[in-house]
């Protein structure tokens, strides 16, 4: 059905023509976060990857100055977005097993995990944009660590 409707072509054309190339991997990441959270599964990677790769290729074709790092950053956005949703969703097997193992309610466990996961997801968006702009992996990881450390120092509490 998706093939006959041309959903992939529609999404590729929509994102490749309307979004600034600097934000495409971050958009892919956020979309994957939403899909995996709603589905409660890593399966979103299989749903989004067939769209993310053509989107990345179309954007690279439309913007000749983009480096070869662009496609791997888009793929990383899909993978990390899928992991985010699988970690946060109250419907995923990981959350259910962790709640059962700790003896707490599944929703209570999911709600306690969300502030941490959303914080890291927001930092990840900055790091994805940094990687999209061509900064090295070492710089991008250091940026993420420094931002997370600053958040801990500013908002963290001593037990």
Where is each model-derived feature located?
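Alpha-helical membrane segments and immediately flanking helix-loop junctions
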Residues: 73-114
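Interfacial segments of transmembrane alpha-helices in multi-pass membrane proteins
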Residues: 37-45, 131-140
């Amino acid at each position: 059905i998706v093939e006959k409707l041309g959903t992939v072509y529609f999404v590729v054309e929509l994102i490749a023509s309307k979004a600034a190339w600097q934000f495409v991997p971050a958009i892919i990441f956020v979309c994957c976060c939403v899909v995996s959270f709603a589905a409660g599964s890593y399966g979103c990677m299989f749903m989004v990857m067939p769209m993310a790769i053509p989107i990345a290729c179309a954007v690279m074709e439309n913007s000749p100055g983009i480096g070869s790092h662009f496609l791997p950053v888009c793929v990383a956005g899909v993978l990390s977005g899928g992991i985010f949703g699988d970690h946060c969703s109250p419907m995923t097997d990981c959350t259910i097993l962790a709640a059962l193992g700790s003896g707490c309610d599944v929703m209570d466990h999911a709600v306690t995990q969300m502030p941490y996961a959303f914080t890291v997801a927001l930092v990840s968006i900055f790091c994805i944009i940094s990687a999209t702009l061509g900064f090295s992996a070492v710089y991008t990881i250091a940026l993420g660590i420094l931002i997370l450390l600053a958040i801990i120092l500013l908002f963290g509490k001593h037990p």
